[in-house]
Amino acid sequence: MAVLNMDEVLKIDSIIDRVLDFSFGVHSRLGSFALESSYKTLIEKFLTKNGHKVECEKLISFNYDGIEIVNGFRVDLLVDDSLIIELKAVKSLAPEHYRQLATYLRFTGKSLGLLINFGGNSLKGNFSRLLNRQFSVPETLNEWIKVRHPFDA
């Protein structure tokens, strides 16, 4: 089991905070009726403009019991090869949306993910940070992680 270090968590969480700030502005201007692809393009351009490497619609291959599955998953955004952002534009998030991101985290080995739903009346209550359970957290980070990342993947 890999151990998260504070520098890595703070770096990724800083990106998450910037994406959320930007997303709240986008949602207040566009509302909840644009296509998911519109929100995705805006976030991709915002992150790229701010110096991040962003892969959009990144195809992910994985190995299952020795069988190589090529292009088995497609993540919405992979930022700096460390953060997976999954976007939705639905009335409300359902358990399968969380499981989808959790699966992406598990099969890619990434530690943190962000799920954002632009389909609600507000972004409040329509986003979640997910922590991959394959990572353990040092004692010094336990309380911080519980506050910032309440949903485990």
What is each model feature region?
Residues M1-K53, K124-G125, R129-A153:
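Solvent-exposed, charged helical/coil patches
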Residues G31, V75-K91, Y104:
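Conserved catalytic cores of phosphodiester-cleaving nucleases, focusing on short active-site segments
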Residues Y64-E68, K124-G125:
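Short, solvent-exposed polar/charged micro-motifs at secondary-structure junctions
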Residues V70-R74:
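Basic/aromatic recognition patch in beta-strand/loop cores that engages polyanionic ligands
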Residues K88-E139:
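Nucleic-acid nuclease catalytic cores
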